[in-house]
């Protein structure tokens, strides 16, 4: 594991190693790390793609204001959480996270073609482009727009946890 840590801090306990998966690969961090700090310590800088043109994005801050490091947490269909900021998620053993808004992966994203055809898709083009025929909206246009939007995938199965309210 490459170690790109700058210095030791009182918040990260380097005696307690924690393993986690990001985009299917196993990495290691330490207790007290956030997902973002562990990714940077492992040399992972590309963590997402921009919404419209799918340009590469990296971690630019260390708090709740982070615009780029937005991840999908969990791999099961009933226990997954989209749109989690990597800068706010503390590492735990067995964490499974993946990047969002890219296909097939964050390094090679098919949506990156939008960057080359950007003159054809100015701001608000979808408000005028997808108006006709009206019957295409539900079956064709809306699913395509949703696929290209930078949102994570919500759980497809019911929540297996029990919440007892008294």
Regions found by a protein language model. Give the residues of each.
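Ubiquitin-like/PB1-type beta-grasp interaction modules and other compact soluble beta-rich domains
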Residues: 1-23, 28-31, 42-80
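Short, structural beta-strand-to-alpha-helix junction motif
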Residues: 34-36
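Carbohydrate-associated surface elements
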Residues: 39
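Fe-S ferredoxin-like electron-transfer domains
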Residues: 51-166
């Amino acid at each position: 594991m490459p170690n790109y840590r700058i210095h030791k801090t009182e918040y990260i306990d380097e005696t307690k190693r924690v393993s986690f998966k990001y985009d299917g690969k196993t990495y290691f961090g330490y207790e007290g790390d956030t997902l973002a700090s562990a990714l940077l310590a492992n040399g992972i800088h590309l963590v997402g793609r921009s919404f419209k043109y799918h340009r590469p994005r990296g971690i630019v801050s260390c708090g709740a204001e982070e615009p780029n490091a937005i991840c999908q947490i969990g791999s099961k269909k009933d226990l997954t959480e989209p749109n989690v900021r990597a800068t706010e998620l503390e590492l735990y053993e067995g964490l499974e996270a993946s990047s969002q808004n890219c296909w097939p992966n964050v390094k090679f994203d098919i949506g990156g073609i939008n960057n080359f055809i950007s003159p054809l898709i100015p701001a608000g083009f979808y408000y005028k482009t997808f108006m006709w025929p009206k019957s295409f909206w539900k079956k064709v246009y809306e699913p395509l727009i949703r696929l290209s939007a930078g949102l994570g995938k919500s759980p497809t199965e019911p929540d297996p946890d029990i919440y007892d309210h008294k």
